[in-house]
Amino acid sequence: MEGPEAVQRATELIEQRLAQEEETEKLRRSAPGKLSMDMLVLEEEKRLGVQSPALQKVKGQERVRKTSLDLRREIIDVGGIQNLIELRKKRKQKKRDALAAAQEPPPEPEEITGPVNEETFLKAAVEGKMKVIDKYLADGGSADTCDEFRRTALHRASLEGHMEILEKLLENGATVDFQDRLDCTAMHWACRGGHLEVVRLLQSRGADTNVRDKLLSTPLHVAVRTGHVEIVEHFLSLGLDINAKDREGDSALHDAVRLNRYKIIKLLLLHGADMMAKNLAGKTPTDLVQLWQADTRHALEHPEPESEQNGLERPGSGRETPQPIPAQ
């Protein structure tokens, strides 16, 4: 292979490698942004997971690609495939660093003078400003103060993972199962944020781990949709109802399959999730597997609990990636 064909093949390999690495990185680092409070948010979370453009790529949407063959050849000739991969990764990291720097809140003042209003108090719960929280509560403010969406400081701090603020709010009487306008509690928000330590703290203060939002989603549903494996594993260790269904009759396994959460699928199966459970559309998890989900279909058809643990293949198993199996 030489000339244009070699360049084309090399470019395809680059893009495949980058897509794989970006997918892995996004799943590992996924930190949900601030969510607008309407029913569309919950419905989109159910269908796509929180902010999951990577999922759309897996489903077959093509990225916009440069078409200049000369440009491709020049790029590859500069330093080879690996150098190009590293260069593009560094550029992406620089963009992430610049974005993080722009979003970083201003430093907290040494001393809070004057009263703290409700808006400032709620904003402090997001930004982790403990002194503002202390001042508001010391002046007699309610720990259950909420905004127009009934989101409290406890909800906000749970999403962000601010443990010290959470403990302070709970010590000052914050209602641990306070429901916002979508019936989400701090437990739901902690699952979205991916903070296992927050889940454990809320649980130790009596939070309901089976509470439902307006989609009838449990915290387990939310953890599955947002891809937080450790939280899913924690809930399963508690013996929660693994087959609990939401408003559309979907179990956690339905959601995991729909979003191609491979490790979570394996975890659910190893803990006895019902593969034959039907949702309101009459579909089982296996029915939802798309052709592009070869690994997922294999997991459903060959659970192999004796050789799998925590969603990972046994070291040295040597099992090849299964080929797609057409849906029946």
Curated annotation (Swiss-Prot):
Posttranslational mods: Phosphorylation at Ser-68 by PKB/AKT2 in response to oxidative stress induces translocation to the nucleus and negatively regulates myoblast differentiation.
Keyword terms: ANK repeat, Cytoplasm, Nucleus, Phosphoprotein, Repeat
GO cellular component terms listed in the entry, alphabetical order: cytosol; euchromatin; I band; myofibril; nucleus; PML body; sarcomere; sarcoplasm
ANK repeat feature ranges: 116-145, 149-178, 182-211, 215-244, 248-277
Region (Disordered): 96-116, 297-328
Induction statement: Up-regulated in response to mechanical stretch of skeletal muscle (hypertrophy mechanically-induced).
Modified residues (Phosphoserine): S36, S68
InterPro entries hit by this protein: Ankyrin_rpt, Ankyrin_rpt-contain_sf
SUPFAM superfamilies: Ankyrin repeat (SSF48403)
A single MF term (Gene Ontology): chromatin binding
GO aspect biological process, one term: myotube differentiation
PANTHER family for the chain: ANKYRIN REPEAT DOMAIN-CONTAINING PROTEIN 2, ANKYRIN REPEAT, PH AND SEC7 DOMAIN CONTAINING PROTEIN SECG-RELATED
Subunit structure as annotated in this protein's UniProt entry: Interacts with ID3; both proteins cooperate in myoblast differentiation. Interacts with TTN/titin. Interacts (via ANK repeats) with TCAP; the interaction is direct. Interacts with TJP1 (via PDZ domains). Interacts with PML; the interaction is direct. Interacts with p53/TP53. Interacts with YBX1. Interacts with AKT2.
The protein's name in its UniProt record: Ankyrin repeat domain-containing protein 2
Species name: Mus musculus
Upper classification of the organism: Eukaryota, Metazoa, Chordata, Craniata, Vertebrata
